[in-house]
């Protein structure tokens, strides 16, 4: 499918903004040091003659307004004198691209993440522009539909912070008058001070943070495919009920994660490696409400961190209800309180002190997750579909591409009453084909 770039420009804040540098926490330094690519798909809701549908002028005017409170995103990724990454609030602006395609929205299929989807619909930074923190592309399709591709640097914002920005931008765009009450009320003032996640002095590490230990990976990255596996409300309810066995009903998260973990072990054939073979499940957690006091609403930065559960493969694939597997998932997340998060921040500070180059050397690195392991990220509870720019809410929102085999996203459908949850999976092609079969077969049990 061909996409033609029509125009590229930089959009800056509509008012003067402070020029200073923002310190980044260790959680900021340990996310992927790249842009997170997402796509929002909108179907035309008005008449074909509506020339104002997704007007670039309206979008850019609103973007200029939202960059006033969110001015760090108009800056650039830089380094301090010691080489530690930081955000330089230069006000240089964000990239805004308009494009068009002779294809239709339906030609995109089910919008499963892929490198092609990212290449077509999300702007990419070349080496010279790698420090740009936010980039957007609006692609107009022959059918009248539109795709907004967003690329926000992960060092600058995690998923919730990025959604706060896009949703506030959309709310301002809905106020076509430009400066009325709706726009003023829409602005969620971001919290810019990241020192709330600074380590204690002296550090006090009270937990084992194995998720941040350097483990031997599986060598080079394997080729992988991605797929979206939808789960209906009825399937979710059946899984939660059957998985509990004689105990209490499982939560959606623990039931689905346990189900995915078991199916992945079976699809990958891990059980044949021997009963003592181990598998580790990584999960991404949010520190915002786990801290006491909680982080301020609108925290602009990364508050996400890793948690994990480890088990023998034989225990995961054992016949019977999912309850035992779900218990492992629940146990791994139950302990993630204020004390745990503070211990993690201190652990990372100690790791940085011991690293070559200090904090400047603290980064996620090129570690490759072993094929025995799984990494699940849940987008449940996030405001994924609130980006209404004045022409309706998105019909679809999701990742444009995934990074590695074994990565799984749990993405809720729009709150239209159907209660659907999409399981988005990246896995080597052979295992993925088996995973699809096992995934739905297990739901019938």
From Swiss-Prot:
Keywords: Acyltransferase, Transferase. Expressed in leaves. Pfam families: Transferase. Hydroxycinnamoyl transferase that catalyzes the transfer of an acyl from p-coumaryol-CoA to putrescine, to produce coumaroyl putrescine. One of its GO terms (molecular function) is hydroxycinnamoyltransferase activity. This is Putrescine hydroxycinnamoyltransferase 1. Gene3D superfamilies: Chloramphenicol acetyltransferase-like domain. It is an enzyme of class 2 (transferase). The active site is at 154 (proton acceptor), 388 (proton acceptor). Its EC number is 2.3.1.-. The gene is PHT1. Belongs to the plant acyltransferase family.
